[in-house]
Amino acid sequence: MRFGLNIDHIVTLREIRKTYEPEILEALFIAKNTHKVDLITIHLREDKRHIQNEDVLRLLEISPLPINIECSINAGITDFLCSLKNKPSKVTIVPENRNEVTTEGGLDCSLKGLGEVIRAYHNKGVEVSLFIDPLKDALHFAREHQVKQVEFHTGVYANLHNALYSNANNQIHAISALKDKSPKELKEELHNAFLQLRKMSKEAFFMGITACAGHGLNYSNVKELLKIPSLRELNIGHSVISKAVLVGLEKAILEMAQLIKR
């Protein structure tokens, strides 16, 4: 299983104060020196709430690890990434809403202009991945557009797992739709969410598409996904950075890697 580390929230801390620290390149090399991280993931948002264009340029210039850039189909973002001399190892196209706190679901594959953006990256020799819900129609869209990799949105699975097996439902930001569900209901829905991820990962494999997954994964809920043999990569960020605030980035990475790479 490949471990993709999302370091957006290193930059979130910097941007809160509009200052120079923490340094994203220091985070990059801490990750690299653990010898456990396979790629670095960043999300270049339209609103630039964390990662900036300059961060992209600096990372691509010196990173010893592959860089996966998440982005929308915004024309300005697409033009910027297609113009880069140093190319990312892949671009993962994600849905984006300026009012969202974080990505809320998989990509709408009927989105106008999506096919053109995929072709633009392919024409520049950049691998494309699509961040999708684990649905067959989305996989068929990927295959029709010669997309060789997808990342399944694991938010539904992760939220259900957290509601059932942690104190998430008692926290200030508890998900209202899950608070009133019984443990039996949560367990059944969690089981179904896992089965859907497993089924679509297998479907992707038979289509010749590499299946990755991410969103909301943490030290507790990630373990079950390791039982899906056709999943090849997990992208995890917020949970690792949250633990890093308390124990340090290196230790937080190593603890996650111990779970993923056992």
From Swiss-Prot:
This is Pyridoxine 5'-phosphate synthase. The lineage of its organism: Bacteria, Pseudomonadati, Campylobacterota, Epsilonproteobacteria, Campylobacterales. 3-amino-2-oxopropyl phosphate binds at residues 6, 17, 216, 237-238. GO terms for cellular component: cytosol. The active site is at residues 43, 70, 215. It comes from Helicobacter pylori (strain Shi470). The gene is pdxJ. Keywords: Cytoplasm, Pyridoxine biosynthesis, Transferase. Its main location: cytoplasm. Homooctamer; tetramer of dimers. Its EC number is 2.6.99.2. The keyword Nucleotidyltransferase does not apply.
